[in-house]
């Protein structure tokens, strides 16, 4: 009888444990855009490894993500794990919304710092503390028509900006009258910032307290940027290019400064006749030390400081960071992996078009890691467009840009001036 009672008690204990197991709430993961649509397809293997760890994915459109993140923080409704664009990370760190990860990274076998592109990893470190694990990477380089470059008399892409300035008018002529050489969308801040970095500009000064856009280095880069438009190499209006892919195929423009998402888009959208007539190349440099530097972009996975289940949240981050998951994620989304071992597993460096990104990612830098960067970037684009259209001169545009940036950074200066406690 005693044995029967013992067996019954054991069964009841197991049942109670199972009930508690089932009632355990799901870990919440917020993922953005296309990534949020497909990440659930990576999770079945995690469920097999850790039966008690359930994950509920919420997909958030990129257009609504920034406001939703801030609203969730204010309302105390942050998820456990979230995807964050690299330029948003400093803002969430300043709010105290994110969990520092260095102590977990130091013990992790799955996440190895030496397997990441250094410039991308650096974008996740704020004031010496790591807050994010890169999930996928993004940077900018040149897509170009190989046939038009050859028609211009160049066997391979130039590695200096001087070389491209010689090639672009010839490519434009080879494409025929009424066309342009290069597409640099007017409302993008990235081209002048990339050129500024290549020319050695710091963008901000005095500990990121003031704008530094009137510096000789940025002024030279900005003048070089404007020259593409003033020489008729790049279109001045948004209506000149109606459909990027159709116009690239027609030769409306021959070169495009853009990112890795267009690897898949070009392959899908260009006509079959152009399948072997386009390529990618790392950015040139002003002085011949190619590749020139580009931006350290992409998205990272972070753990909310408010999460009551930080160990489980970190387990999810580690899982999604595994090279095998990175490869599968690349196949689902076209997003370039953040880990170099995942690139090799997917044989990406062997693909000539992807290899250009592999090379470029060895030469990337993050934008200034301050919460105000998004507002500063918008101001750069605004004054850049005004100068392109001839509404402002170079000096007037940069003076106004510095003035606006100094206003944006006013609170930062005040906070940094306070005595440390």
What is each stretch, according to the model?
Residues 152, 223-235, 243, 268-335, ...:
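Extracytoplasmic/periplasmic substrate-recognition and gating elements
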Residues 102-116, 181-182, 201-220, 268-273, ...:
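Short, solvent-exposed loop/beta-turn-alpha elements that line the ligand-binding surface or hinge
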Residues 45-116, 125, 150-152, 156-159, ...:
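Extracytoplasmic "Venus flytrap"/periplasmic binding protein-like
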Residues 168-170, 207-238, 283:
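Glycine-centered hinge/linker elements that transmit conformational signals in sensory
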Residues 119, 278-282, 330-382, 386, ...:
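Long, aromatic- and glycine/proline-rich binding clefts that accommodate carbohydrate-like moieties
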Residues 127-135, 140, 165-211, 253:
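Extracytoplasmic/periplasmic solute-binding protein
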Residues 71, 79-80, 109-148, 180-181, ...:
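A structural signal for short loop-to-beta-strand junctions that line the ligand-binding cleft
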Residues 86-141, 165, 196, 275-281, ...:
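Hinge/lid segment of periplasmic solute-binding proteins
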């Amino acid at each position: 009888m005693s044995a029967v009672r013992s067996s019954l008690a054991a069964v009841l204990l197991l049942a109670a444990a199972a009930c508690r197991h089932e009632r355990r709430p799901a870990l919440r993961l917020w993922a953005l855009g296309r990534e949020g649509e497909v990440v659930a397809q990576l999770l079945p293997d995690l469920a097999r490894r850790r039966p008690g760890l359930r994950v509920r994915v919420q997909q958030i459109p990129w257009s609504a993500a920034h406001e939703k993140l801030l609203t969730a923080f204010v309302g105390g409704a942050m998820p456990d794990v979230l995807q964050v664009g690299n330029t948003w990370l400093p803002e969430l760190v300043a709010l105290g919304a994110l969990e520092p990860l260095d102590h977990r990274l130091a013990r992790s076998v799955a996440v190895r710092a030496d397997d990441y592109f250094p410039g991308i990893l650096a974008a996740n470190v704020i004031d010496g503390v790591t807050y994010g694990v890169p999930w996928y990477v993004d940077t900018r380089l040149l897509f170009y028509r190989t046939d038009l470059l050859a028609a211009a008399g160049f066997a391979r892409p130039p590695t200096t900006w001087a070389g491209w300035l010689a090639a672009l008018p010839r490519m434009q002529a080879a494409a025929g009258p009424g066309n342009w050489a290069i597409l640099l969308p007017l409302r993008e801040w990235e081209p002048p910032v990339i050129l500024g970095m290549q020319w050695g500009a710091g963008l901000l000064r005095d500990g990121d307290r003031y704008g530094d856009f009137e510096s000789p280095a940025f002024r030279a880069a900005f003048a070089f940027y404007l020259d593409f438009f003033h020489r008729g190499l790049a279109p001045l209006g948004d209506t000149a290019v109606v459909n990027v892919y159709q116009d690239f195929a027609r030769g409306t423009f021959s070169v495009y400064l853009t990112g890795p998402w267009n690897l898949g888009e070009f392959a899908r959208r260009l006509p079959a006749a152009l399948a072997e007539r386009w390529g990618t190349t790392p950015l040139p440099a002003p002085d011949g030390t190619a590749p020139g530097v580009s931006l350290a972009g992409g998205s990272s996975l972070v753990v909310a400081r408010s999460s009551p289940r930080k160990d489980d949240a970190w387990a999810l981050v580690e899982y999604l960071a595994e090279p095998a998951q990175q490869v599968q994620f690349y196949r689902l989304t076209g997003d370039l992996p953040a880990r170099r071992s995942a690139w090799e597993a997917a044989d990406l460096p062997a693909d000539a078009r992807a290899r250009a990104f592999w090379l470029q990612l060895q030469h990337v830098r993050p934008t200034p890691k301050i919460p105000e960067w998004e507002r500063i970037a918008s101001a750069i684009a605004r004054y850049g467009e005004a100068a392109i259209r001839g509404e402002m001169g170079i000096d007037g545009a940069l003076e106004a840009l510095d003035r606006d940036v100094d206003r944006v950074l006013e609170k930062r200066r005040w906070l940094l001036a306070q005595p440390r406690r």
